[in-house]
Design a protein with these regions (language model features):
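Mid-domain alpha/beta scaffold segments of enzyme catalytic cores
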Residues: 1-145
Length: 145
């Protein structure tokens, strides 16, 4: 998608899409999201470590996310959360990384974008115990109840 990004954005605009958010899922894609957002007026970015990538988060990832968040184009921390469906990272690490990123979002007064795949109880437990300003559920696999 990076190869024809201008065309994708042009088509989106021609279909009345006014703004687009490019989601970061690790440090590399978070940086790329910020770079893209800074190139296009109506594109914004999130920065974060996706649950799948939690086990590979470098020790300094919070500092790097905070630096990236200095861009005025960063509108949220995410995609963060817990994914019990694919289990690419151990659940305890996913939870730890989610909480750390929630703390960063709270400190920076940014909303969170969270990913919940077969993890309702775990996600709600974290959301109840840790403060956040606003949240967007990007992925969930349960019913509306």
């Amino acid at each position: 998608m990076y190869e024809n990004l201008s065309e994708v954005l042009r088509l989106a605009e021609s279909n009345h899409v006014k703004k687009t958010i490019c989601i970061g899922t690790d440090l590399e894609t978070s940086l790329k999201s910020v770079e893209i957002a800074e190139q296009y007026e109506n594109v914004f970015a999130t920065v974060g470590i996706h649950p799948h990538d939690s086990k590979d988060a470098p020790k300094n990832y919070l500092l790097e996310l905070e630096k990236l968040s200095e861009s005025k184009k960063v509108v949220a921390i995410g995609e963060i959360g817990i994914d019990n469906y694919r289990n690419h990272s151990p659940q305890d690490i996913q939870k730890k990384v989610m909480i750390e990123q929630m703390d960063l979002a709270y400190k920076l007064n940014l909303p969170i974008v969270f990913h919940n795949r077969d993890a309702d109880n775990e996600i709600f437990d974290v959301l109840k115990k840790h403060p956040f300003h606003k949240a967007l559920s990007h992925c969930f696999s349960s019913n509306l109840d």
